[in-house]
Amino acid sequence: RARFEEMVSRVIAYIHAGDIRQANLTQRLLGHLPAGLDPFMLYRRLRVLSPAPFSAFLTVPDGTAIASASPERFLGLDAQGHVVTRPIKGTRPRGRTPAEDEALARELVGSEKDQAENLMIVDLLRNDLSRVCRLGSVAVSELAELESFANVHHLVSEVRGTLLPNLGPVDLLRAPFPGGLITVAPKIRPMEIFNELVPPRRGPYCGGMSCLGFDG
């Protein structure tokens, strides 16, 4: 805790100095699986406890297993070149009773802080997509709409565009990566500060997973 509080203090100092406007500090928590437990069984349990539309399980050659349950679509591209990103910024827990749940949802929708942060991410993604999409095609189709999941309420926005005809999925992925939800804006200086303050490197945590198919 002391280490994390020190990181927060240093980030606040960077904000006061004008280096950044905000930062997304996190802590990586470590645990140990019981001997013999199949990581895929852990993933299946995760899907029960925290169902999400973009759940994924991946194993890599070094034996690492990655289990993810994310409600966020970072990027989508169909065969016609239509691009969509649905950033999330703004979160409240689900309530223990219907009345508490509704109150928490109203609080989130009415939060000026969460609305401002959501708008910042939308502006960042509009700029990112404009570099690889047809001129005039990038537009905000949803702004800070409330969406409720098993354990949380989120504010979700949607930005759409049409990919330039001479570009492909990899070009699209390069434009906004790493995601603005993690880096915030502007991107470069916050990433430099993360590398300085947050040991070890985040790796798959706060990263992204993708699937490329012939249908886009």
Which residues does each predicted region cover?
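Extended alpha-helical targeting/anchoring segments
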Residues: 1-216
